[in-house]
Amino acid sequence: KIFGTADRSDAIYSEPRVWAGHQMFSPRQATEETPESTELPFIMKPDHKLSIFDAQNYLSNHYEGTKFDPLGHGEHAHKYRPISLAKTQESHILQMNRPSANIHWLAMGVDAESTYVPFFNGITDTPAPYKRGKLPAQLNSAYWIFKHASVLVDSHLHDFLPLLRDVQKERNAAAIKMIAETDRRLPSLKGEARATFLTRQSDGYATDTLNAYKKLSLELITKMTDYCELNFNTDENL
């Protein structure tokens, strides 16, 4: 057994997040577990082979699909600390032992409302927006570009979340395509040519993703003009 604390704070802060992972990846083995179970397996074999997107989904989890989702309603909506929450500043995944170049996946801001961007091992530079992120907020910063879209989505979650999900799905599909292209071409490149190619591929995807989120933010702002309380419905007969 692995020993640790087992107090009330763990039942709210730690154990529910482990439970969420077991429900996602090993539900057939975790049928008797509850969010506050104190005896949880330290190692558990998943029911299926996990992909990089499974890892991303876990780190973005906020108990969606359960009564414990903070985005829901009811007495249980804020009972447990989720994995992804508004205080998340950035999230990282290291994808190792790849046949070509390893990948550092980086999500800026709230990962549940962001996109994991792949940066290849061996790059020599990153886009300028990824080098900025100080206060006050500035929209030439990758962090604030993602955060801007996130807070806009939060303002009218029911209407805007599907638009965000569409962008996330498109960007994930583009990542798969870009990585496959990189893996296909990389074996023929060496030295400086390899580094230049990896940098160009990473930069291109990162920049396209920032542009996608900028476009989303403008779309959301445009739609939000219809939600303004300072409005008046003119009689159609006038």
What are these model-predicted stretches?
Residues 1-238:
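C-terminus-biased signal that marks the final domain/tail of proteins
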